[in-house]
């Protein structure tokens, strides 16, 4: 059998509402449950599924079907948690609200049933909601017919309380360990705590605490799952801490001290995981509740330590608020009264710490001692202390912080009596008024009993130091307390027996003689033999008792110690070698220590460096591992999110395709039904009952319609043909008979028309006459009102005219004022615009004049620059010409000298003289190429060649005077320099002329190039500036800063 087709949520909701309307709520719940738990529901949109869930949880609450609600809510959470978390919160809040409303209604109903009884507490006496009917209650209901309040509550209220408890537990199970539903989870947990507190459900509170504890433990176990909570997140951890603090408060209110202590441990575990410190207000609550727990468990030592931590926290909060470093929201509000109260409780709780052991047995066994140490270590960690507290440490800390000044006067006096000026004979008389004041305070009354134990302990310890035996009556008289806290002799004897049993006291009671005998047997006290016999509160407190004198037992125990000390002192005085050996050993040890100190220090430093490196390496490794883990987790989460997104997209795509197919199918079916209806109503003779809509399509329907229309057309044509044939003969016969009666009918018609006309005419005349008479009468009645109307109209017209004139004149005045104002504004605006135009014109003229002046200055500068450039160019041309002439003459002299040397070697005649050489025409040679790049506007090689030719054609005297002029010219690095003028001229084979100038200093090639490539804007020293009589030419001036050509143009 195929599965039933999937129904839309809207149809399911409508069906359920119909069933509810006819009183079939269970059937409606079954329909909704089947739809919600169906796998096909996952593809339904959340917006259409939410109303179904709201009705579903409402029916579950009405019918108390918790299991069905749990199944449906689980399924709904899996559907909606990836798309819309808000709808889950709406449904669950509705579920809880309905359950709470049912409990309230059940309470009202129970009150109505038991209206004759007094109003009792809002909770029944059922201890466990999961075990309501016990055999005792069933037997009691059977044998007793009395209708009591408890029985009414058990029958009416308790089932709904159980359902509400199951509701909270179901919601917490659904929301657990889901980061997207975490806020709702914490809110539900707080509501569950309030439920337990309101109805005093201690058993359910224990189960709730265990449930939350398991959820936190499973959070770390399933941290790799999608949407898992992360306890490393500060916000998540803070929410869990808030929940645990509320759990602690409820546990203290319900006086469930074991659960409160476990809540303290949970809070301490969460605080150890937190990366940021907890708020001071939370820690103040933590220490306050911890102090109450220790007080209930009679652990007065850790109770006093908790009060000490609480006071320190209050002091730090007050200092932080005073310095402006914290906010009032994060720090508890502290007043002077609060500080006084806290200081008093710190001092009073420290005084209440027992001086001797409070354990019930001697406890000298190793396993018991180890268990006690482990317990103390746990409690110390809960308090956040480095080492276990002690009575002396707490007193020393209190005195250092000045608590005596802040404490109440009676507490200060109590401290002085017990710890400073303790006197056994007058202790009770001094402390009686203080105990009365303490007992009058409900909060301090709890410390009276431990204070009595401390007083009795001190009393017997000091009596044992002074007396060997005392009368019981004397002891009873010493141990007298105020009336509400009186101690009986039996209680004193019980205290003595417990102290002797634990080894803290060595007392024998003789009831026959009525005497207390303090044990003088030097071997009777086992206190020294059992180091673990004392409790944690008193193991180091024996020395704090005021020592009046040593007992015989103590003298016997210390005999060997005293003998050793005496012998040691005697040896020091009698035997010098003893001292020398000891001194030598001491010196040797000191020398070894000094020798090894430096090495040990270096080793310590090296070890410290190594430890630091290892720590850094471990930290780096841990951070790297955390980063890698976070990266892997992030990648995994991204992959899961992408896969989830892809799945949702695929599902959305499939749902869209299915919706389109369904819509197309629905439209097709509607069109087919519409066409069938049209066919049924428009075309006769078609039976559509036998037609299957599933197999029917548009083409077949069109063919059926056309066939039927064709059939109808043929039948109609046949009927028309038959009827026309019959009508032709009948109509001809009718018309022949009508011709005989037409004149008579015409005359009768004329007569009827005339009668009708006369009747209508008479009626019209009558109505007109009546209307005229009525109008004339109305005129006569209204004519009396015409003068009054005229006078009233005239009066109204005059008033309106006067008012109009007033308004017209006011409007004219306003118009004139506006007109004047407008004229003034226009004139002012025109004057301002004219001033602006004039100012603009002045600025424009000034700008034009300035631009013209700048242009003229620029042109003048440009002309000046061109003139300077032309002058410099002319100077350079002249200088190049002179240098070329000098070079030509030098070359000729070298050639003559070479010719003379060659003639001397060969024995020939001397070559012609210089004058003869000059007379010969100059032979044209190839131009000298200056391979050094030139910058500027220097002469070309053709110009230089022309200058050489002109110099060769000059007369001889000019050539003879050239060397004298040559000395006065500065050396140019850009042109040719003769060998005898260079720094290395002595290496030349030719001897320079005697009348030539002295050799100049060698200038490197790059400096010559830079000198030859200087811009024309640099100034040159004129040739006449160099003195002719100096041996060395004057040094060239320092090169000026180079200026770009565009800036030279601007200047």
Swiss-Prot record:
Instruction: Write out the GO MF terms.
Output: mRNA binding; translation initiation factor activity
| Any one GO CC term of the record | eukaryotic 43S preinitiation complex
Location of the PCI domain: 339-523
Record keyword Coiled coil present? yes
Q: Which InterPro entries match?
A: EIF3A, eIF3a_PCI_TPR-like, PCI_dom
What domain of life is recorded for the organism?
Answer: Eukaryota
Instruction: Provide ranges: composition bias, Basic and acidic residues.
Output: 617-632, 642-664, 794-901, 916-926
Query: Which Gene Ontology BP terms does the record give?
Result: formation of cytoplasmic translation initiation complex; translation reinitiation
The UniProt similarity line reads: Belongs to the eIF-3 subunit A family.
Biological role = RNA-binding component of the eukaryotic translation initiation factor 3 (eIF-3) complex, which is involved in protein synthesis of a specialized repertoire of mRNAs and, together with other initiation factors, stimulates binding of mRNA and methionyl-tRNAi to the 40S ribosome. The eIF-3 complex specifically targets and initiates translation of a subset of mRNAs involved in cell proliferation.
Q: What is this protein called?
A: Eukaryotic translation initiation factor 3 subunit A
What is the gene called?
A: tif32
């Amino acid at each position: 059998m195929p599965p039933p087709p999937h129904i839309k949520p809207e149809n399911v909701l409508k069906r359920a509402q119909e069933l509810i309307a006819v009183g079939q709520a269970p059937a409606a719940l079954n329909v909704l449950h089947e739809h919600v738990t169906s796998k096909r529901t996952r593809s339904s949109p959340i917006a259409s599924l939410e109303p179904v869930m709201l009705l579903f949880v409402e029916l579950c609450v009405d019918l108390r079907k918790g299991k069905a609600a749990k199944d449906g809510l689980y399924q709904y959470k899996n559907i909606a948690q990836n798309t819309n978390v808000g709808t889950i919160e709406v449904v669950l809040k509705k579920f809880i609200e309905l359950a709470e409303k049912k409990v309230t209604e059940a309470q009202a109903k129970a009150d109505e049933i038991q209206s004759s009884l007094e109003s009792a507490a809002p909770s029944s006496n059922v201890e466990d909601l999961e075990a309501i009917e016990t055999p005792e209650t069933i037997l009691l209901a059977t044998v007793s017919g009395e209708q009591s309040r408890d029985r009414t509550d058990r029958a009416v209220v308790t089932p709904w309380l159980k359902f509400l408890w199951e509701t909270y537990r179901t919601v917490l199970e659904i929301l657990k360990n889901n980061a997207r539903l975490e806020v709702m989870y914490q809110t539900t947990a707080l509501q569950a705590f309030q439920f337990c507190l309101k109805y005093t459900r201690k058993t359910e509170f224990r189960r709730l605490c265990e449930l939350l504890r398991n959820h936190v433990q499973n959070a770390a176990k399933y941290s790799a799952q999608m949407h898992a909570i992360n306890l490393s997140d500060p916000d998540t951890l803070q929410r869990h801490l808030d929940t645990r603090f509320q759990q602690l408060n409820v546990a203290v209110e319900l006086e469930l001290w074991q659960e409160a202590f476990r809540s303290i441990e949970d809070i301490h575990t969460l605080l150890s995981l937190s990366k940021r410190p907890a708020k001071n207000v939370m820690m103040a609550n933590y220490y306050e509740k911890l102090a109450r727990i220790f007080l209930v468990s009679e652990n007065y030592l850790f109770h006093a330590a908790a009060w000490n931590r609480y006071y320190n926290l209050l002091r730090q909060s007050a200092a932080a608020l005073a310095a402006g470093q914290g906010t009032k929201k994060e720090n508890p509000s502290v007043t002077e009264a609060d500080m006084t109260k806290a200081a008093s409780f710190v001092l009073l709780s420290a005084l209440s710490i027992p001086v001797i052991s409070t354990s019930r047995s001697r406890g000298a066994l190793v396993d018991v001692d180890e268990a006690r140490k482990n317990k103390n270590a746990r409690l110390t960690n809960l308090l956040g202390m480095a080492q276990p507290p002690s009575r002396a440490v707490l007193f020393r800390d209190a005195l250092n912080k000045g608590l005596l000044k802040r404490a109440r006067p009676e507490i200060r006096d109590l401290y002085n009596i017990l710890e400073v000026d303790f006197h056994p004979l007058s202790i009770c008389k001094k402390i009686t008024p203080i105990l009365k004041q303490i007992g009058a305070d409900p909060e301090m009354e709890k410390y009276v009993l431990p204070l009595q134990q401390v007083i009795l302990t001190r009393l017997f310890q000091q009596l044992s130091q002074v007396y060997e035996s005392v009368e019981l009556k004397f002891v009873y008289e010493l141990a007298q307390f105020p009336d509400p806290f009186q101690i009986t002799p039996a209680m004193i004897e019980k205290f003595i027996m417990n102290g002797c049993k634990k080894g803290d006291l060595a007392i024998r009671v003789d009831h026959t003689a009525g005497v207390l005998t303090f044990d003088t047997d030097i071997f009777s006290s086992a206190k020294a033999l059992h180091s673990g016999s004392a409790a944690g509160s008193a193991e180091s407190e024996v020395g704090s008792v005021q020592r009046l004198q040593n007992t015989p037992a103590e003298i016997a125990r210390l005999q060997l110690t005293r003998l050793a000390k005496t012998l040691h002192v005697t040896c020091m005085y009698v035997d010098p070698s003893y001292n020398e050996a000891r001194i030598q050993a001491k010196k040797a040890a000191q020398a070894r220590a000094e020798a090894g100190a430096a090495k040990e220090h270096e080793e310590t430093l090296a070890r410290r460096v190594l430890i630091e490196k290892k720590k850094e390496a471990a930290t780096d490794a841990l951070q790297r591992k955390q980063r890698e883990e976070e990266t892997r987790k992030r990648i995994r989460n991204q992959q899961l999110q992408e896969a989830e997104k892809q799945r949702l997209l695929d599902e959305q795509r499939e749902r869209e395709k299915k919706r389109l197919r369904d819509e197309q199918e629905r439209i097709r079916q509607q069109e087919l039904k519409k066409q069938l209806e049209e066919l049924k109503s428009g075309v006769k003779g078609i039976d559509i009952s036998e037609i299957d809509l599933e197999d029917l399509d548009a083409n077949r329907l069109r063919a059926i319609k056309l066939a039927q229309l064709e059939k109808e057309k043929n039948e109609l044509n046949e009927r028309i043909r038959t009827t026309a044939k019959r009508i032709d003969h009948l109509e001809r016969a009718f018309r022949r008979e009508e011709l005989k009666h037409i004149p008579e009918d015409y005359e009768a018609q004329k007569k009827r028309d005339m009668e009708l006309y006369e009747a209508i005419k008479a009626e019209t005349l009558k109505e007109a006459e009546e209307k005229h008479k009525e109008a004339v009468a109305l005129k006569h009645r209204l004519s009396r009102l015409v003068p009054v109307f005229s006078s009233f109209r005239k009066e109204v017209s005059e008033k309106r005219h006067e008012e109009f004139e007033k308004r017209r004149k006011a409007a004219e005045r306003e118009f004139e004022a506006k007109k004047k104002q407008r004229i003034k504004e226009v004139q002012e605006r025109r004057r301002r615009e004219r001033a602006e135009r004039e100012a603009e014109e002045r600025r424009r003229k000034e700008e034009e004049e300035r631009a013209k002046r700048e242009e003229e200055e620029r042109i003048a500068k440009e002309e000046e620059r061109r003139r300077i450039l032309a002058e410099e160019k002319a100077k350079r041309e002249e200088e190049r010409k002179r240098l070329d002439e000098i070079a030509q003459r030098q070359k000729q002299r070298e050639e003559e000298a070479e010719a003379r040397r060659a003639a001397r070697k060969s024995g020939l005649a001397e070559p012609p003289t210089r004058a003869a050489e000059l007379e010969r025409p100059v032979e044209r040679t190839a131009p000298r190429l200056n391979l050094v790049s030139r910058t500027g506007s220097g002469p070309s090689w053709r110009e230089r060649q022309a200058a050489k030719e002109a110099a060769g054609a000059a007369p001889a005297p000019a050539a003879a005077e050239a060397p004298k002029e040559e000395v006065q010219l500065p050396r140019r690095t850009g042109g040719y320099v003769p060998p005898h003028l260079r720094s290395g001229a002595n290496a030349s084979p030719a001897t320079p002329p005697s009348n030539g100038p002295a050799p100049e200093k060698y200038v490197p090639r790059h400096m010559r190039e830079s000198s030859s490539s200087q811009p024309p804007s640099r100034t040159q020293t004129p040739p006449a500036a160099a003195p002719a009589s100096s041996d060395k030419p004057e040094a060239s001036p320092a090169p000026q800063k180079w200026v770009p050509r565009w800036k030279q143009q601007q200047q």
